[in-house]
Amino acid sequence: MADLSALKEIATTAEPAAPVHVKKVDAQGRSYATGKRKDAVARVWIKAGSGKITINGKPFSDYFARPVLQMILQQPVVAAARDGQFDIDATVAGGGLSGQAGAVRHGISKALTYFEPGLRPVLKRGGFLTRDSRVVERKKYGRAKARRSFQFSKR
């Protein structure tokens, strides 16, 4: 009986091990992550720097001309209060501009957590680490589009 009570005591005092997040950086001091949104896939590298953001070799303000897309891109860095501290280089392909901006945002968020694991709770709370799984609904036969039916004529 003493053995059983000792085991119960060990079971109650032992805490489940929290996952340890280790900093993932390559030889050049960069963290790499991929982000996805709709049909777009972004490969993102971040390193400590002056805040320069490059998308497919162009400044992000040239690649994403609409201010809304530029804001989407900067959200994770601003939420983490690290504005102007990282140089971000991304290559993105597939989809349209909105999907590409979302993919780069997702990639930046993941790369930030690899570079600085302490930022994970802040970015998780903001919803930046969650992959947005919404994609275009497929077209069905017998219909004009996914849900729209052909025009109905009584006569």
Curated annotation (Swiss-Prot):
The keyword Ribonucleoprotein applies. Pfam families: Ribosomal_S9 (PF00380). GO terms for molecular function: RNA binding; structural constituent of ribosome. One of its GO terms (cellular component) is cytosolic small ribosomal subunit. GO terms for biological process: translation. PROSITE patterns: RIBOSOMAL_S9 (PS00360). InterPro entries: Ribosomal_Su5_D2-typ_SF, Ribosomal_uS9, Ribosomal_uS9_bac/plastid, Ribosomal_uS9_CS, Ribsml_uS5_D2-typ_fold_subgr. Keywords: Ribonucleoprotein, Ribosomal protein. The keyword Repressor does not apply. Belongs to the universal ribosomal protein uS9 family. This is Small ribosomal subunit protein uS9. It comes from Rhizobium meliloti (strain 1021) (Ensifer meliloti).
